[in-house]
Amino acid sequence: MFKTPSNLPKINNTFMYCYRSLGKIAAILYIVLGSMVIGFLIFPVIRLFSKEKNDFFVKARRYVSNVFKRFLFMLKITGIVEMRVPEMERLSSMKGKVIVANHPSLLDFVCMTALVPNANCIVRANLTRTPFVGIISQIYITNDENYDDLFKACKEDLDNGNNVLIFPEGTRTPRFKRNVYQKGAARIAVYAGCDVQPVFIGGCDKYGLGKHDPLFSFNPVEKYFYDFILLPEIKSSDYAGMPTPAAAKRITDKIEEEILSANAEYRKNCRNCRTFNNV
C-alpha cells in the first residue's frame, strides 16, 4: 500500500506509520502558520520594546529558539520525534563560534535554532519565498547578500558573542549520494578570526523530511531520532598565514572529514536506531 525507498525496511506497523505521517504533516502546518504569526504579529511588538537593531535581533532570536523548543517538546510527547544532546549545556552556552552541521532533514534548522538561542543563521535565499519568510527575512542572513556585507554582518555578530550557524552542504543531503561542502563557513571563520564548531546530526533515517520525499511518508519502522554530537573544534589560528582560499579549503576539508568520520563511528556503535541518516 505504502512504498518506501529501497534502502529502508518494509513498514512494520501500518497504524503507527499513518499516525506518525499525519503527525508530521500537522507539525509542518503548525510551523508554517506559527512562522507567519511570529513574523507579522510578534516581531513588531518585540521591535517596539527594543532599543536598537541588534537588541531586536537578540530578543527575536531567543524568542524563536524558545518557540522551537516548545514545538520539539510537543513532537516528543506525541511520539513523533526523540532527541538526544549529550552536551546540551556546552552547545547552548557557546559564544563567538561558526557552528556547522550536516543536513539530513527539514527539521535540522528548527532543532539547531532551539539548541543554540544566540545563533544567527545563513539560509538559502529561496526560503524567503516560503511561509518561513516572516522569520527569515527579519532576523537571519540570506546567502544572496553581497559577500562583503554578509561577511561584515557575520563578523559583527561573532564579535558580539553570538554564533553563526551554517549547513555547509547548502541543502538537505540526498538519499543516495552526497552534496559538495561549500567553503562559505570556512571563509567566514577565517575572515572573523573565530573557531569552527562541527556538529554531527546522527540518528535514524529521516524519510519523510528529506529532499523530494512524499508529504505522506515517514520512517517505516521507528520514530524520528536525532542525536546531536559535538565534534572537536577547528581552530582558525592553525591556518593563520595561509592565503584565504587555501585556508578555507583546508578548513572545509577538515569539517567534512570530521563529520564523515563521526558518521562511520556512529553507525558502528549506535544501538538506538534500526536505520541511519545518509551523510
Model-derived features: positions:
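A transmembrane-helix-recognition feature enriched in membrane-embedded lipid enzymes
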Residues: P9-R84
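Hydrophobic/aromatic ligand-binding patch that stacks against planar heteroaromatic rings
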Residues: C111-M112, I136, E156, R187-Y191
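Short gly/ser/thr-rich secondary-structure transition/capping motifs
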Residues: T78-P86, E145-D148, L209-D213
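Soluble, non-transmembrane catalytic domains of enzymes that act on hydrophobic metabolites at membranes
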Residues: M1-F15, F71, T78, M83-P86, ...
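A cross-family acyltransferase "interaction/gating" segment
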Residues: T130-G134, F176-P243, F276
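Hydrophobic beta-strand scaffold residues
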Residues: E82-M83, V164, V196
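Residue-level preference for the first positions of well-ordered beta-strands
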Residues: G96-V98, G161-F167
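Catalytic core of membrane glycerolipid acyltransferases/transacylases, capturing the structured
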Residues: F43-N66, T78, S93-N146
